[in-house]
Amino acid sequence: MNINLKGKVAVVSGGATLIGKAVVQALVSAGAHVAILDIDAKGKAIAESFNHGVMFIQTDLTSDAAIHQAVADIHQHLGEVSYLVNLACTYLDDGFKSSRQDWLQALDINLVSTVELSRALYNDLKKQQGSIVNFTSISAKVAQTGRWLYPVSKAAIRQLTQSMAMDFAADGIRVNSVSPGWTWSR
C-alpha cells in the first residue's frame, strides 16, 4: 500500500518507545514531518536518527502548560497538525496493591493525556480534516493476574475512542484505535 502524507504534520506521543519509533518510521516513510512528544529523553536520539523532518520535544503530558508549549513549538517549526497518534503510557501497575496515587498517575498519563493532547490539537485537526489514532492494547480485553491499572486505562481509551469518533465526525476528524497484541514496547 502506498500512502502519501507528503507535507503533512503528525504528532506521536510516546514516540520514544519501540512501537513509537516504528510509528514514526512509517509516518516518515509516507512523507510526513513528525513531532515526537515524550518525557523520555531517548526520543531525541530517535528524532536524530532520521535525516530530516522529525523533531523531539521532551514533554510531560500530565502538564497542560507543557502540552500547550509543545503545540506552539510544533506550529513554529513544522506547521499545523493533520495526524495525532496517542501512544504515551505508563506501565505502573501493582494490581490490588496499587495506591490511589498510582491509580491517578496511571490514568493521568494513559487516559487524560490522550484527551488533553487531542483537545490541544483539535482546531488543527478540524481545519486539516485530520485523524487521531489512539493506542489501546489487548490488555483492554484480556484479564491479567496482578495487573489492574494498565488494563483498565486501556479499556477506557477504547471507549474514549468510540466517543471521540462520534463527537468529532461532524468536524471531519476521524478517530480510531489500534490494539496491539502482547509485545515489549521499550
Model-inferred region functions:
Residues 123, 166-167:
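Alpha-helical segment proximal to the catalytic Tyr-Lys
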Residues 87-92:
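Conserved NAD(P)H cofactor-binding loop of Rossmann-fold oxidoreductase domains
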Residues 137:
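Residue(s) in the substrate-gating loop at a strand-loop-helix junction
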Residues 94-107:
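Substrate-binding pocket helix/loop in short-chain dehydrogenase/reductase
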Residues 3-35:
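Canonical Rossmann dinucleotide-binding motif of NAD(H)/NADP(H)-dependent dehydrogenases/reductases
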Residues 118, 153, 161:
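Active-site helix of classical SDR
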Residues 98, 143-151, 163:
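Active-site loop-to-helix junction immediately N-terminal to the catalytic Tyr of the SDR YXXXK motif
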